[in-house]
Each structure stands twice: as structure tokens, then as C-alpha cells.
């Protein structure tokens, strides 16, 4: 993944006086890694949570157990709850989240490998997008992290305006 999008997101946040956090599942910290590869990231990026299990989603991000049971971990409502949880936990102005299936298998709800949900929690609301990605595990993880960062970039450049 290229770090230029991470640098652009950090610069846009810096210019607007905004802070950023992340809640990651299938990306396993790739968003945080891309952001912290950039010198000065600590002025903007407050931190991230790798919530690889439902237990951590529940206990750290406060994703309701009933939501996980009803919708499954790989779903728009859970991506939304993860982003909100990261925003509350860190006090960040913006929080990204990613949950999905990087492979090698789909889930018991019929979601195939490459099903990914990204979300951005902002003061105006929460924006959620669904992806259907191809590639191997590493490619799906990298594309998911890149898409989440691009989602932040699009929000910061007013290309996303309708949140829940």
C-alpha cells in the first residue's frame, strides 16, 4: 500500500484541526501502521484498536453483543458500531473502522471472502461502505486499509456528505 494517501489524510486532518483514530479487525493494524509510518502522525492520529475477536469488539469498543449475534461481525451495523466505539474510546474527531473476510474462508452467514465493511464516524454522522474485493489474503487486507484511508480522504475533501 502506498503511504501517500496516509500522508494526505494526516495533512488534511492537520489543516482542519481534527484528530483521527481507528478500529481494525481484518486489517490487523495496517491502517495504524500506514499512518504512523508518516513523521508527525502523533499530531493527528490518537491510536487504534485491533479488535480481531468479538470479545474485544464487545469489551473494548463496546459493540453490543446482541448486534454481533444478530448481524454478525462482518456487517455494516458492526462496522458502524466499531467506528463509534473507537471515536468514544479515544476522543478523536474522526474514527475509521474495518471489518471483513480476508480469507481463506467465508463466514457462516454466507459472506464470501473479500466481503469488507468500512466506516467513518464523524461529528455529522457515520458513513459506511461495503466492498467486494478480490485477491489473496494480503491483497484483501491491503485494499481494505487503503479504502478506509481513502474514505477519510473523501470525507475531508467533501466527497462524502451523507451519513447515518
Identify the meaning behind each predicted range.
Residues 1-164:
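Short alpha-helical segments enriched in small residues
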Amino acid at each position: 500500500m502506498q503511504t501517500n494517501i496516509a500522508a494526505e489524510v494526516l495533512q488534511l486532518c492537520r489543516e482542519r484541526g481534527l484528530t483521527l483514530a481507528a478500529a481494525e479487525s481484518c486489517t490487523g493494524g495496517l491502517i495504524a501502521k500506514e499512518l504512523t509510518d508518516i513523521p508527525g502522525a502523533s499530531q493527528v492520529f490518537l491510536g487504534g484498536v485491533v479488535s480481531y475477536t468479538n470479545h474485544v469488539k464487545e469489551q473494548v469498543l463496546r459493540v453490543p453483543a446482541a448486534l454481533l449475534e444478530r448481524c454478525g461481525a462482518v456487517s455494516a451495523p458492526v462496522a458502524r458500531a466499531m467506528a463509534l466505539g473507537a471515536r468514544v474510546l479515544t476522543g478523536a474527531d474522526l474514527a475509521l473502522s474495518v471489518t471483513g473476510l480476508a480469507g481463506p474462508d467465508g463466514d457462516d452467514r454466507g459472506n464470501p471472502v473479500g466481503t469488507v465493511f468500512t466506516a467513518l464516524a464523524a461529528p455529522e454522522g457515520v458513513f459506511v461502505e461495503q466492498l467486494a474485493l478480490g485477491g489473496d489474503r494480503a491483497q484483501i487486507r491491503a485494499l481494505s486499509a487503503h479504502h478506509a484511508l481513502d474514505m477519510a480522504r473523501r470525507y475531508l475533501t467533501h466527497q462524502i456528505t451523507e451519513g447515518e
